Amino acid sequence: MAHIEKQAGELQEKLIAVNRVSKTVKGGRIFSFTALTVVGDGNGRVGFGYGKAREVPAAIQKAMEKARRNMINVALNNGTLQHPVKGAHTGSRVFMQPASEGTGIIAGGAMRAVLEVAGVHNVLAKAYGSTNPINVVRATIDGLENMNSPEMVAAKRGKSVEEILGK
């Protein structure tokens, strides 16, 4: 979670984890590096990437490219979530709920990075089970993908937005 930088198209990039891995062969061990990154525009678009290479910069670059290719749109509501959501991936489960203005991002580790680049400013979040960064990122993105805006719900049910919101 070291750096965040702006780039062309105003995408925010965050490095979540770099890990050294090894492959054991007859002549010894071959070391390589993995990098986990998230990319977002700060306005509801977010993606993650996982890259692997013999050198750290190459692994980060691969991860950033994959993150830019795998972006999703998230329907935010004034810098917070539409409603409480749950996400899961393998052993990781996350719970996120909207928070009032001024609360900030109350989330740990990898989940915080995803929410920051997605453009969420106020949220209460908790990770349960495995806290493996890759699985937490996937679970967070799963939860954000499953979130519906009132417009989406109204379209699915064939009702007006006012009926859905109870106004």
Swiss-Prot record:
GO biological process, one term: translation
Function as written in the Swiss-Prot or TrEMBL entry: With S4 and S12 plays an important role in translational accuracy.
Pfam families with a match to the protein in the record: Ribosomal_S5, Ribosomal_S5_C
Family, similarity comment: Belongs to the universal ribosomal protein uS5 family.
Source taxon at top rank: Bacteria
Classification via InterPro entries: Ribosomal_Su5_D2-typ_SF, Ribosomal_uS5, Ribosomal_uS5_bac-type, Ribosomal_uS5_C, Ribosomal_uS5_N, Ribosomal_uS5_N_CS, Ribsml_uS5_D2-typ_fold_subgr
Protein name (database record): Small ribosomal subunit protein uS5
PANTHER family (UniProt xref): MITOCHONDRIAL RIBOSOMAL PROTEIN S5
Entry GO MF terms: rRNA binding; structural constituent of ribosome
UniProt comment concerning the protein's domains: The N-terminal domain interacts with the head of the 30S subunit; the C-terminal domain interacts with the body and contacts protein S4. The interaction surface between S4 and S5 is involved in control of translational fidelity.
Signal peptide: none
Species name: Shigella dysenteriae serotype 1 (strain Sd197)
Alphabetic keyword roster: Ribonucleoprotein, Ribosomal protein, RNA-binding, rRNA-binding
Annotated Gene3D superfamilies: 3.30.160.20, 3.30.230.10
Assembly with partners or alone: Part of the 30S ribosomal subunit. Contacts proteins S4 and S8.
